[in-house]
Amino acid sequence: MSKKPTTKKTAVRKPARSKKTVAWKRSDGRAFDELRNLKIESGVLPNADGSAYIEMGRNKIICGVFGPREMHPKHQAKPNEAVLRCRYHMAPFSVDPRRSPAPSRRDQEISMVMRSALEPAVFLERYPRASIDVYIEVLEADGGTRCASINAAAVALVDAGIPMRDLVAACATGKIEDKLILDLGDYEDKKGQSDMPVAYMPKLNKVTLLQMDGIMSTKEAEEALNLAIEGCKKIYEVQREALKKKYGIDQNQVKPEKEFQPEEIEEEPQSEEGHQ
């Protein structure tokens, strides 16, 4: 029998596929340093001294400010300055499933956080023995309600005519999948490794609130703080636009008020009679 010719099989090496770098996107499609959609309106409650409405992502929050007015109960009044009182409350229909209408411990904690963030911006010493009351009602919650509430409250305080050193803007950063992100949504807030809410006065370059939940390295915490401050600056511009839209005022022309400095006052020259 004739043998069939054998053909040698040569191994062909396929060229390796080039790995394309794909920009990392979050669950809602945003970039790591991108804010959610933001809308702020001032003067939305006719019976309040000042008010504001904010939509930050799917968060929908309304704020009313009453005062300065006489403090009740009177024994809680401070003789040298006003008392800033904040009340944060989530409507039963703001989350799914519905929550109890009774104030929770979280509501009380965020109320205290808001007061701490706003107090450094308000000239409380101008209204001794008075109260300034800030009421927050969350109509729909989507993560980051404390920061959104602070943003609305700052605009409402200005709308009430209360003198302030600067507007307070608030934003949170966090870490998810070992990446730092800006303005956490509800999913990122629950599934992330850490979060850092920050409140900031841009013109005065002062941080009025800094919290952190979770674990970050020192370098990550510094980067997260800088990222949050950049987010606050963007929110600050939206706050200004909301006030300019109502009052037609360009706040670039308004300089932040300085605190009393004795060395800035020049002594008047005494007359000759004063030396006699």
Residue ranges and their predicted role:
Residues 2-276:
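Polyanion-binding surfaces on beta-sheet-dominated domains and ring/shell assemblies
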